[in-house]
């Protein structure tokens, strides 16, 4: 049985990356440097824009983060793909929180819009995931819309984020 808390600390997220949070068969978050959040501040089975589940997580920004040194030299900005990946990470994390088992894989996204950027001067990135549907049959899959905010201002939106959990990824 999964301990369905409403919030998770950085240590909890790191435990997920080691396969210790959702059991031996539960999905894992990536380890640092690809773990794109410091904490999950809210998880619910209802709520969100569609009343089918909601996740909110945060990433503290500091100018020494690895991506600022290489993307781009003289023009540091967090790659937009990392914000997108964070949203996929949270969809998979939610599926594990619901008790889903398997290895998480991003399956696609409907549309992504970038209307801002994360600079080294930012303080905090907030991710909000609004679930539209969870399929829990032979295939476990989450479908959600997401948004990324920097210091309270929305800068990315994504529709139809899809993540599946797979028992066997050898033919993926």
From Swiss-Prot:
<dbReference type="GO" id="GO:0005737">
    <property type="term" value="C:cytoplasm"/>
</dbReference>
<protein>
    <recommendedName>
        <fullName>3-hydroxydecanoyl-[acyl-carrier-protein] dehydratase</fullName>
        <ecNumber>4.2.1.59</ecNumber>
        <ecNumber>5.3.3.14</ecNumber>
    </recommendedName>
</protein>
<keyword id="KW-0275">Fatty acid biosynthesis</keyword>
<keyword id="KW-0276">Fatty acid metabolism</keyword>
<comment type="similarity">
    <text>Belongs to the thioester dehydratase family. FabA subfamily.</text>
</comment>
<dbReference type="InterPro" id="IPR010083">
    <property type="entry name" value="FabA"/>
</dbReference>
<comment type="pathway">
    <text>Lipid metabolism; fatty acid biosynthesis.</text>
</comment>
<dbReference type="GO" id="GO:0034017">
    <property type="term" value="F:trans-2-decenoyl-acyl-carrier-protein isomerase activity"/>
</dbReference>
<keyword id="KW-0443">Lipid metabolism</keyword>
<keyword id="KW-0413">Isomerase</keyword>
<feature type="active site">
    <location>
        <position position="71"/>
    </location>
</feature>
<keyword id="KW-0444">Lipid biosynthesis</keyword>
<dbReference type="Pfam" id="PF07977">
    <property type="entry name" value="FabA"/>
</dbReference>
<dbReference type="InterPro" id="IPR029069">
    <property type="entry name" value="HotDog_dom_sf"/>
</dbReference>
<comment type="function">
    <text>Necessary for the introduction of cis unsaturation into fatty acids. Catalyzes the dehydration of (3R)-3-hydroxydecanoyl-ACP to E-(2)-decenoyl-ACP and then its isomerization to Z-(3)-decenoyl-ACP. Can catalyze the dehydratase reaction for beta-hydroxyacyl-ACPs with saturated chain lengths up to 16:0, being most active on intermediate chain length.</text>
</comment>
<dbReference type="InterPro" id="IPR013114">
    <property type="entry name" value="FabA_FabZ"/>
</dbReference>
<dbReference type="GO" id="GO:0019171">
    <property type="term" value="F:(3R)-hydroxyacyl-[acyl-carrier-protein] dehydratase activity"/>
</dbReference>
<keyword id="KW-0963">Cytoplasm</keyword>
<comment type="subunit">
    <text>Homodimer.</text>
</comment>
<dbReference type="GO" id="GO:0006636">
    <property type="term" value="P:unsaturated fatty acid biosynthetic process"/>
</dbReference>
<keyword id="KW-0456">Lyase</keyword>
